[in-house]
Amino acid sequence: MVWCLADLRAYVLVLLVISGLYQGSDQLIPEKCGEDCTPGWDCHFNSYYKYIPNAKSWTDAEFYCQKLYPGAHLASIHSEDENDFLTEITFKNNSNYPVVWVGGSDCYKDRSFVWTDGSQWDYQKWRQWEPSNTGGREPCIDFNFVTPGLWNDEHCDQKFPFICKYTTPCRY
């Protein structure tokens, strides 16, 4: 069966109506919208973040996040506010080794970055001269490399701590 985007949207809308989540607008009704934070996670609006101190390669870190919590991935970043929040989490948990993996990469096509959670690439905050592909392809993104809050492209086999994220539907 071949689905076009309009068919898929209609199918999802039907499922939302049947499940009672759709209330006549484009918004989903959340359970609590970040008011109650999952123990051990840091909350910011309707997203939940967990700093993992164990250094892993980018790929192993992504798999770890997926196993940790349903719907979790390496963190995607969509605003200056969220970027600042992740900087705080990183330094709160480890001021000596602030470099962490986040979920961005251009593994599939050089300079076409995507997030592992499938969300839109709508924000970026690169260090000066980045992304650089220094020493060959550097398809994975680390955060806080040399300068707090700024991004760097890196070889994916490097081992760093990382931040996992999951997001719940929310209406404000």
From Swiss-Prot:
Residues 36-172 form the C-type lectin domain. One of its GO terms (cellular component) is extracellular region. Residues 1-20 form the signal peptide. Keywords: Disulfide bond, Glycoprotein, Lectin, Secreted, Signal. GO terms for molecular function: carbohydrate binding. Disulfide bonds join 65-164, 140-156. The keyword Signal applies. Anterior part of oviduct. SUPFAM superfamilies: C-type lectin-like. InterPro entries: C-type_lectin-like, C-type_lectin-like/link_sf, C-type_lectin/snaclec_domain, C-type_lectin_CS, CTDL_fold. Glycans are attached at residue 93. It is found in: Secreted. Heterodimer. Protein synthesis increases significantly under estradiol stimulation. May be involved in protection of eggs and embryos against microorganisms. Calcium-dependent lectin with specificity to D-glucose and D-glucosamine. Can agglutinate microorganisms in vivo. PANTHER family: MANNOSE, PHOSPHOLIPASE, LECTIN RECEPTOR RELATED (PTHR22803). This is Lectin. It comes from Pleurodeles waltl. The gene is LEC.
